[in-house]
Amino acid sequence: MKRKNNKFIEISIAFILGIALGLYGQNPDYFTNLISQKSLALSALQIKHYNISELSRSKVSTCFTPPAGCTKFIANQIDKAEESIYMQAYGMSDALITTALINAQARGVKVRILLDRSNLKQKFSKLHELQRAKIDVDIDKVPGIAHNKVIIIDKKKVITGSFNFTAAADKRNAENVIIIEDQELAESYLQNWLNRKASN
């Protein structure tokens, strides 16, 4: 009985494959166009390309751990914010960055944060400390994990990279941070932030 079932499956697959190849032979452009349309649709919705000449006009700074020091690098950028800070974070437990965000809120900077849901249960998360400071903090309810590490400052500067906003990222892990000062790029990141916020 098992052999008969296997034989039936093999014949069915061969039959379907034969039909597909026959259709492709008659009209190969249909399949090519279909794939191209799908790819173009994805690009239009999710992908923004930047060429080297565009980014070469931007001011770019980097930081790497080890050695420690990227936390201060990020906090200094937050201290320079004048109008707005939009943040996305997976881990949010660093005291220095939290203090910089609270100070920014206190001096009138608009601070908005999206965190991964794990912060609701993590012992060292600064979620509640940020909320007590009247900062608008929301949970990104993506089905998986909200793994972004992004800070958008004054809609013209983007901080991103592998660096979680935690003490471990600065003192124990091998991480990277990149800061790009480019208004168009910042607007692209901000639009993604707003889309994630709206989806919640």
From Swiss-Prot:
It is found in: Secreted. GO terms for cellular component: extracellular region. Residues 1-25 form the signal peptide. SMART domains: PLDc (SM00155). Pfam families: PLDc_2. Its EC number is 3.1.4.4. It is an enzyme of class 3 (hydrolase). It comes from the Bacteria. Coiled coil: none annotated. One of its GO terms (molecular function) is phospholipase D activity. It catalyses: a 1,2-diacyl-sn-glycero-3-phosphocholine + H2O = a 1,2-diacyl-sn-glycero-3-phosphate + choline + H(+). Keywords: Hydrolase, Lipid degradation, Lipid metabolism, Secreted, Signal, Virulence. Residues 142-169 form the PLD phosphodiesterase domain. Homodimer. Belongs to the phospholipase D family. Could be a virulence factor. This is Phospholipase D. It comes from Rickettsia conorii (strain ATCC VR-613 / Malish 7).
